UniProtKB/Swiss-Prot annotation:
Pathway where it operates: Isoprenoid biosynthesis; isopentenyl diphosphate biosynthesis via DXP pathway; isopentenyl diphosphate from 1-deoxy-D-xylulose 5-phosphate: step 3/6
Any GO MF annotation of the entry: ATP binding
Pfam families in the record: GHMP_kinases_C, GHMP_kinases_N
Domain of life per record: Bacteria
Kinase among keywords: yes
Listed name of the protein: 4-diphosphocytidyl-2-C-methyl-D-erythritol kinase
Secretion signal span: none
Length: 280
């Protein structure tokens, strides 16, 4: 069985509180894009085995896809094992939920094999035990996410808008970013209602005017080259550019495919990891 595991971007990310256990309460507008890993599942006798074309991801119980298979087996008392092969295309440590999407793909695949009557809501309850982005990745599409990311409200589809993504040659520790933002004074929060309104109207220009990621307060201050990437995307015709998740990937929206391709060529001459994609 092959399952596509799609990347996500944050059209907005806001922090609205902190739980007693230290997890931050968020308001996010999330969007699936046409950049994906391919997760191959093969049922075997007993154990869980994981392999990949990317040597930089863990191939043991640290991998979220492994954790997903293990939790699914334990939850439903599945005796069979599974061989997982991850064909990795989404950059790692990028703010694109690659690991969470792989985990969601494993859950969806095992659901289809062993528990076909299990709905996404029930599957998401398992997913949140693996990671906060996993429930959203089970649903995909355009969504407003609250809590730590597990409360999901589907929004009108925001499809076929082109974007260019640039992943710098370093990763970002999500935990460190959130601990640092606790020490910052947040003066301006994203206008989430206006962002949701722009999606309802399928208005890309209005979205780009309002989209905002509160974590940029930390990451762009520490990594000035991310500011440079944003400026370059805007210089090459982007209607709006922003960091996704805790970074470091920066994306920019474009009105037409041609303008996105033009920007892609220019950015590719400067940076190693550049992608052209569209919302789906």
């Amino acid at each position: 069985m092959k399952i596509k595991a799609y990347a996500k971007i944050n059209l907005s990310l806001d922090i609205v509180g902190v739980r007693e256990d230290g997890y931050h309460l968020l308001e996010m507008v999330m969007q699936t894009i046409d950049l994906y890993d391919v997760v191959h599942l093969n049922i075997k006798d007993k154990d869980i085995e994981i392999n990949s074309n990317n040597c930089n991801i863990p191939l043991d119980n640290r991998n979220l896809a492994y954790k997903a298979a293990k939790l699914f087996k334990e939850t439903f008392n599945i005796k069979e094992g599974v061989e997982i092969y991850i064909e990795k295309n989404i950059p790692i440590e990028a703010g694109l939920a690659g690991g969470s999407s792989d985990a969601a793909a494993v859950l969806r695949g095992l659901r289809d094999i062993f528990m076909p009557n299990l709905n996404n809501k029930e599957l998401a309850k398992i997913g949140v035990r693996i990671g906060a982005d996993v429930p959203y990745c089970i649903y995909g599409g355009t969504a407003f996410c609250e809590g730590i990311g597990e409360k999901i409200t589907k929004l009108n589809p925001f499809k076929d808008h082109y974007l260019v993504l640039v992943k710098p040659d370093f990763g970002i520790c999500t935990k460190e970013t959130y601990s640092k933002i606790d020490k910052k004074e947040i003066i301006k929060h994203p206008d989430t209602k206006e962002i949701i309104k722009s999606i309802g109207e399928n208005n890309l220009k209005l979205l780009c005017k309002n989209m905002e990621n509160i974590l940029e307060i930390v990451t762009l201050e520490e990594r000035s080259n991310l500011k440079d990437i944003k400026k370059e995307l805007l210089q090459y015709g982007s209607l709006g550019a922003q960091m996704t998740g805790s970074g470091p990937t920066i994306f920019g929206f474009f009105p037409y495919r041609d303008s996105a391709e033009n920007c892609y060529r220019k950015m590719k001459s400067k940076y190693n990891e550049v992608y052209i994609s569209k919302t789906i």
